[in-house]
Amino acid sequence: MIKKAIILCGGTGSRMFPLTHSVNKQLLPILDKPMFYYPLSLLMLCGIREYVFIINKNQENNFSKALGNENDLGIRVKFVVQESPLGLPDAFSISRKFIKNQSIAMILGDNFFFGSMLSPLIRKSFKLKSGCNIYIYPSNKPSSYGVVEFNKKNKIKKIVEKPKKTNSNSIITGLYTFDKNVVNFTKKLKPSKRKELEIVDLINLFPPSTRAGGQDD
């Protein structure tokens, strides 16, 4: 059963400049709450109580103020600084002391998830014993994302990052769950052409029989 989660709140937020000139994108307000509150709330609804926030340098105080008293929320939070943007899987490497050889969930701090059956679906996937779970959604422009391709038995065949051609319209979202092997698998990754570790490459290291996809319409 997954009991811990990583929330990714780093990055440069370059596409939202100048709003992100002096503050992380995930701290920007959406209605009456900072952006990161929404993915955090989703995981809290699913029973997660221990978190590590991956943040940029000199941002811990800002996130602490935005979060408020974690005891009032009934959660425990640690902050880990990502010194440079080395890709999503780097979060597992720098959080290995937090993970402690356990299964873990990871969510992007700037993503929004909504659906009538979403929480039950996620709770079910949090019973993960081995392998990994990814959450997929249909897209009209799949080539702009990581695309999940299936075999004839509707099992995940492979995941391709921004393919030029594909017969699938299922894209990966910003929520993942991995078993205790994730830290060791991350060590096997090599930087892509972008000079970053790619989440797609990490998922593809898990045996096909242990990869599962979830979708809430």
PLM features: residue spans?
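Conserved donor-nucleotide/metal-binding helix-loop-beta segment in metal-dependent transferases, i.e.
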Residues: 115-143
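Active-site glycine-centered loops adjacent to acidic/histidine catalytic or metal-binding residues
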Residues: 11, 110, 138
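A structural signal for short hydrophobic beta-strand segments in well-ordered beta-sheet cores
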Residues: 27, 148-150
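Catalytic-core segments of class I nucleotidyltransferases/pyrophosphorylases
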Residues: 105, 119, 126, 155-207, ...
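Alpha-helix/helix-capping structural signal
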Residues: 11, 58, 180-181
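Conserved N-terminal catalytic core of the sugar/cofactor nucleotidyltransferase
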Residues: 1-7, 15-21, 28-29, 33-108, ...
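Ala/Thr-enriched low-complexity intrinsically disordered regions
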Residues: 210-212
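A short acidic, often aromatic-flanked loop/helix-cap motif at beta-alpha or helix-coil junctions
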Residues: 85-88, 141-142, 165
